[in-house]
Protein backbone atom coordinates (compact mmCIF):
# COMPACT_ATOMS: atom_id res chain seq x y z
CA UNK A 1 0.00 0.00 0.00
CA UNK A 2 1.35 3.39 -0.97
CA UNK A 3 1.91 6.09 1.63
CA UNK A 4 -0.60 8.91 1.58
CA UNK A 5 0.85 12.36 0.93
CA UNK A 6 1.15 14.36 4.16
CA UNK A 7 -1.26 17.06 2.94
CA UNK A 8 -4.02 14.42 2.49
CA UNK A 9 -3.51 13.18 6.05
CA UNK A 10 -3.60 16.76 7.38
CA UNK A 11 -6.80 17.60 5.46
CA UNK A 12 -8.57 14.43 6.63
CA UNK A 13 -7.47 15.09 10.23
CA UNK A 14 -8.61 18.74 10.06
CA UNK A 15 -12.00 17.70 8.70
CA UNK A 16 -12.42 15.23 11.55
CA UNK A 17 -11.48 17.84 14.15
CA UNK A 18 -13.83 20.42 12.59
CA UNK A 19 -16.67 17.89 12.55
CA UNK A 20 -16.03 16.93 16.19
CA UNK A 21 -15.98 20.60 17.23
CA UNK A 22 -19.14 21.28 15.28
CA UNK A 23 -21.12 18.51 16.93
CA UNK A 24 -19.85 19.52 20.39
CA UNK A 25 -20.34 23.30 20.02
CA UNK A 26 -23.07 23.63 17.40
CA UNK A 27 -26.59 23.91 18.88
CA UNK A 28 -27.98 22.68 15.55
CA UNK A 29 -25.92 19.47 15.42
CA UNK A 30 -28.95 17.44 16.61
CA UNK A 31 -32.72 17.86 16.86
CA UNK A 32 -33.80 19.58 20.08
CA UNK A 33 -36.14 22.05 21.77
CA UNK A 34 -34.92 25.53 22.75
CA UNK A 35 -36.71 26.40 26.00
CA UNK A 36 -37.97 29.98 26.24
CA UNK A 37 -37.23 30.01 29.98
CA UNK A 38 -33.53 29.28 29.34
CA UNK A 39 -32.99 32.21 26.94
CA UNK A 40 -31.16 35.16 28.48
CA UNK A 41 -33.00 38.48 28.19
CA UNK A 42 -31.14 41.55 26.95
CA UNK A 43 -32.90 44.87 27.57
CA UNK A 44 -32.09 47.88 25.38
CA UNK A 45 -32.11 51.50 26.54
CA UNK A 46 -35.48 52.04 24.80
CA UNK A 47 -37.09 49.17 26.76
CA UNK A 48 -36.98 46.63 23.94
CA UNK A 49 -36.15 43.05 24.93
CA UNK A 50 -34.29 40.42 22.97
CA UNK A 51 -33.61 36.73 23.58
CA UNK A 52 -31.01 34.89 21.50
CA UNK A 53 -32.31 31.43 20.64
CA UNK A 54 -29.29 30.04 18.80
CA UNK A 55 -26.49 30.59 16.29
CA UNK A 56 -25.26 27.49 14.51
CA UNK A 57 -24.69 25.63 11.29
CA UNK A 58 -27.10 23.25 9.60
CA UNK A 59 -25.89 19.86 8.39
CA UNK A 60 -26.25 21.24 4.86
CA UNK A 61 -23.69 23.97 5.64
CA UNK A 62 -25.81 27.12 6.02
CA UNK A 63 -25.22 29.31 9.06
CA UNK A 64 -28.49 30.10 10.84
CA UNK A 65 -29.37 32.22 13.86
CA UNK A 66 -32.60 33.06 15.63
CA UNK A 67 -33.70 35.55 18.25
CA UNK A 68 -37.01 36.71 19.71
CA UNK A 69 -37.68 40.41 20.28
CA UNK A 70 -40.32 42.51 21.99
CA UNK A 71 -40.52 46.17 20.97
CA UNK A 72 -42.73 48.38 23.20
CA UNK A 73 -45.21 50.74 21.55
CA UNK A 74 -43.83 54.18 20.80
CA UNK A 75 -40.15 53.26 21.09
CA UNK A 76 -37.62 54.60 18.64
CA UNK A 77 -36.38 51.67 16.55
CA UNK A 78 -32.77 51.22 15.46
CA UNK A 79 -31.99 53.45 12.45
CA UNK A 80 -31.95 52.18 8.87
CA UNK A 81 -29.18 49.62 8.58
CA UNK A 82 -27.82 47.08 6.11
CA UNK A 83 -27.33 43.42 6.99
CA UNK A 84 -24.88 40.90 5.57
CA UNK A 85 -27.24 37.94 5.78
CA UNK A 86 -30.91 37.27 4.94
CA UNK A 87 -33.70 37.37 7.52
CA UNK A 88 -37.22 36.07 7.96
CA UNK A 89 -39.15 38.03 10.60
CA UNK A 90 -42.26 36.25 11.89
CA UNK A 91 -44.70 38.60 13.66
CA UNK A 92 -46.19 36.96 16.76
CA UNK A 93 -48.05 39.94 18.25
CA UNK A 94 -48.62 43.58 17.31
CA UNK A 95 -48.04 45.46 14.06
CA UNK A 96 -44.63 46.13 12.54
CA UNK A 97 -43.69 48.56 9.80
CA UNK A 98 -40.88 47.38 7.52
CA UNK A 99 -39.10 50.35 5.93
CA UNK A 100 -36.97 49.33 2.94
CA UNK A 101 -36.08 50.42 -0.57
CA UNK A 102 -38.00 53.71 -0.21
CA UNK A 103 -41.28 52.08 0.88
CA UNK A 104 -43.03 51.10 4.09
CA UNK A 105 -45.00 47.87 4.44
CA UNK A 106 -46.92 46.59 7.45
CA UNK A 107 -47.16 43.10 8.91
CA UNK A 108 -49.40 41.85 11.71
CA UNK A 109 -49.66 38.58 13.64
CA UNK A 110 -48.76 35.64 11.41
CA UNK A 111 -47.19 37.94 8.82
CA UNK A 112 -43.67 37.25 7.62
CA UNK A 113 -41.19 39.93 6.57
CA UNK A 114 -38.34 38.86 4.29
CA UNK A 115 -35.19 41.00 4.46
CA UNK A 116 -32.85 40.17 1.58
CA UNK A 117 -29.07 40.22 1.93
CA UNK A 118 -27.78 43.80 1.88
CA UNK A 119 -31.19 45.49 2.18
CA UNK A 120 -31.10 48.90 3.90
CA UNK A 121 -34.03 48.63 6.31
CA UNK A 122 -35.62 49.34 9.69
CA UNK A 123 -38.42 47.61 11.58
CA UNK A 124 -40.59 49.57 13.99
CA UNK A 125 -43.64 48.92 16.13
CA UNK A 126 -46.57 50.98 14.82
CA UNK A 127 -49.25 49.36 16.98
CA UNK A 128 -50.83 50.41 20.28
CA UNK A 129 -49.19 47.65 22.34
CA UNK A 130 -45.93 45.75 22.35
CA UNK A 131 -44.84 43.98 19.16
CA UNK A 132 -43.34 40.52 19.52
CA UNK A 133 -41.49 38.84 16.66
CA UNK A 134 -38.99 36.09 15.89
CA UNK A 135 -36.05 36.75 13.57
CA UNK A 136 -34.42 33.88 11.68
CA UNK A 137 -31.05 34.86 10.17
CA UNK A 138 -29.66 32.83 7.28
CA UNK A 139 -26.15 32.79 5.79
CA UNK A 140 -23.62 35.58 5.59
CA UNK A 141 -22.39 36.97 8.91
CA UNK A 142 -24.93 35.02 10.98
CA UNK A 143 -22.18 33.23 12.93
CA UNK A 144 -21.08 36.47 14.64
What are the residue ranges of the model-derived segments?
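Short acidic-glycine-tyrosine-enriched beta hairpin
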Residues: 103-117
Amino acid sequence: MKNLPLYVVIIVFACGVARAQTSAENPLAAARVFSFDEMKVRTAANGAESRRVFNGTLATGESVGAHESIQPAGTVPPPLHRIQHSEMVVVVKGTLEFDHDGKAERAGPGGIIYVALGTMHAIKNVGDGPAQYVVIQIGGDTRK
